[in-house]
Amino acid sequence: MIIVMSSAATEEQIESVIKRIEEKGLEANVSRGIERTVIGAIGDERNLDQELLESLPGVEQALHIVKPYKIVAREWHKEDTVIDIKGNLIGGNQIQIISGPCSVETPEQMEKAAKAVKAAGVRLMRGGAFKPRTSPYTFQGKGVEGLEMFRAAADKEGLPIVTELMDARQLDTFMKYKVDVIQIGTRSMQNFELLKEVGKVDVPVILKRGMSATITEWLMAAEYIAAGGNHNIIFCERGIRTFETYYRNVLDVTAIPVLKKETHLPVIVDPSHAGGKAWMVAALSRAAVAAGADGLLVEMHPNPNEAWSDADQAINPQELIKLMSELRGIAKVIGREIL
């Protein structure tokens, strides 16, 4: 069972609910979000009186949720959650595109990329300062130096930044450089200690699907973040590993409506990692938006032929402009918009 406290609930009222739960022999898991506090009652729920709990001061509602994920479940939060990133909304009627290079390379490259992102009408910029790579011999990212370059280039164009966190020890550095959105990559989706730490900060999180993760495993990973108090979670489908070897991954478009049914949180898609080739990006992007995705994470490099990593899947600035035009047309047809 979860008990949702009202936004005006006092600390005394929250403690009163916790006491009631513990008196019945259950454990109380308290998740303190920005808007409200959610208390999960863990144990034999038959000992709890739902009506009695709902009558307590400060309680908005109490719900029996059968599924293993509670806070991220749509059962208690029927309306879609809309996440505000410096005035840029993810979720709701607006579709948000996030674009930029795979890796932060040089100040000049990042300045060109930021200008190209802005010129295409994209409102958020992505870029990797710390890079998890399959081979230990490939470029691993610029680290803190890269974060400095990224922040400086994006600030010149007024763009919020999205970058991947690989290690909880880097979190203080991310806070220092005021990273606007933390990305948890596919390899870290079940790094539960990292998820717990990210759950403690007031920064939106993009949670990428593990390359072999089921929908339930993905939702449970998000529950780790939400249980820590951070409810600003964005799911990102980036393709799953199957028997097919012609392309990099298989984009699971079916996951979009399934997640929309199971959770109130926004769902975006990474078409670049799904196909692994630049020529696939536009088609996969169109499919994702048509299927109901709330946004896209698209790799764009000022000069893909010179990219230090993932050159094959990066589109160029002109292709990004064309893609944005196509996506606006699709968004209009399905009653949504890309500003």
Residue ranges and their predicted role:
Residues 126-144, 301-312:
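Glycine-rich, proline-tolerant flexible connector loops at the mouths of alpha/beta enzymes
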